Amino acid sequence: MSQWNIAAAQYAGQHHSVDDHVAHHLRFVAKAAQQRCDLLVFPELSLTGPGKTDLLPPPDDAQLAPLLAAAKRYRITIIAGLPLDLNGQRVKGLALFSPSRHSILRYPQGSGASLVPGDKQLTIVDTHADSPNLDPQATLFTSCQSVGDTRWRQSINTLQRFAHRYAIAVLMANARGGSALWDEKGQLIVRADKGELLLTGSLGRQGWQGDIIPLG
């Protein structure tokens, strides 16, 4: 792949139904497709919202089918956040919509995910482990978040150190603003302010380049 185009969706939809969340996601997907993105990453629990007290029920595949169709139509891999029922517990999870798969893959959110350009699956990473289980071929680590200023500052410091220590680019999609991309040296490439937008990154022969694309 001569150039890899990625984007973080700074998505903060306040909807009461999964269908409305999906429709809102599709606006971001269409905008990312206009930018010729190969990968689009949404924040934590983007498909349901956080819920007032407990995590909401996980959406079923039929509710999410429009996103899988969009992944195939635009040839774009989509990672979105949703609740997941795992071993009798409801936890934060990720949904992977791949243009080369006929079904939706679901994973526990963990601390994030690493992936290889063009691959059909994610490797969920525990950044708190002594030696994170990063795929040695991975080019990018993604972090889906929905944090305010105090936790955001903690997150960006942690992710920048992670990028430098493990020599991997890091893309953070944060619902509340400040989404960012660091290169494999831990250097900040681009960081967003608040509001709904796409934060994009392109990996080519000259390294990473970044931009901010308004949603409207």
Give the positions of each predicted feature.
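Short polar catalytic/cofactor-binding loops
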Residues: 10-15
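Active-site catalytic loop in hydrolytic enzyme cores
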Residues: 85-137, 148-149, 154-157, 195, ...
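Cys-nucleophile CN-hydrolase/nitrilase-fold catalytic domain and related Cys-dependent amidase chemistry
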Residues: 18, 22-100, 149-168
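Short beta-strand scaffold segments in enzyme catalytic cores
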Residues: 80-82, 93-96, 114-115, 178-182, ...
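Binuclear metal-dependent phosphoesterase catalytic core
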Residues: 188-215
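Structural motif
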Residues: 38-39, 122, 139-140
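CN hydrolase (nitrilase-like) catalytic-core segments centered on the catalytic cysteine
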Residues: 62-79, 131-198
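Extreme N-terminal starter segment of soluble prokaryotic enzymes
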Residues: 2-8
